[in-house]
Structure formats: C-alpha cells, structure tokens
Amino acid sequence: MGRRWVLAIAGSVLLIGSCAEEQPEYLAVDYESWERTVASDLTEIVPGHGGGLRRIYINSIGTDAVLDDDGAIRYPDGTIIIKEAHTVTDSSDLEAPAALLGMVKAPGAEDARGGWIWVYRHVDDGTEEIFAEEYCITCHANANESHPYGEGNPRGAFRDFVFYPY
C-alpha cells in the first residue's frame, strides 16, 4: 500500500509539472534581420550595459512609432527592441554578443515596468530572465528628459524610455 501511495504522488507531481505554463520567449532569434534604431555602432559607455560596442534592433511593429509635434515618441504595443552588448569596442573584432538585452512593449503585462517588459537573454544557453524590479526602468526613465547619450533629447520630450529612438 505504501509503494502505491508513493507512486500515485510521484505521478501527480509529474502530471502537474507537465501542465505548468512555460514563460514565453520574448527576444526573437532572427532579430538581426530587423532594422537598427541607429545605423552606427554605439561605443560610448552607458551605465548598466558594459563598456563594449552595442547594436540596437527594432521589430517592424516598433517602426510604426508615433512622433508627436512636441517631439514625444510613443511605441505601439508589441514593439520589441533588442540591444546586443559586446565586450569589444572595435567592430572589426566583433564576435557573438556577450549579452542580449530587450524591451518588449506590453503595458498590460504583470511584469511590465513603464509599459515595457525588460528582458535579459543568457547567450550561453538561450534562457531569458525578466527584470521585474525597478533596475532597468530607473535608468531608462532618464531617456524621457535631456540626457548625455546620442543626440541627448535636448527638448526633454517623452521618449517612451528609449535612449536611441527609431
């Protein structure tokens, strides 16, 4: 009787575990076919992204961003922005990225901060981690005012948390 009980519990655990909802994969594998938000490679040091070269890609939904008369930019739901972070600063030495960082516009999502889900893909195994705390949004809020990166948003317009808008 004891062995049957153990087998029944083990079977139930396996059945319940197999029904668990998997976390969706947010960052597309084919992102390199997307448009880049900035044509050039970015090499200036940006806190939180390492000191190497960066390339930023945006999906086709994001290319329909709305630019208001006051310079504000709003990205449509479903926009995905992926930043490759490299360890080198010279594109002639470029290899696979050290990290992939992403923003997914999903204002209604439980894990969204500022209307975006902030994602880190581990390049070694392809798993993704959602930053549900305030780490990313705290820095990216600065994109909505004048800042020292790129063209600097001199008018301090709302940029939907994106430093290098499309």
Where are these regions (language model features)?
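Short, intrinsically disordered low-complexity segments
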Residues: 2-3, 54, 158
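C-terminal motif of bacterial Sec signal peptides marking the signal peptidase cleavage site
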Residues: 15-18
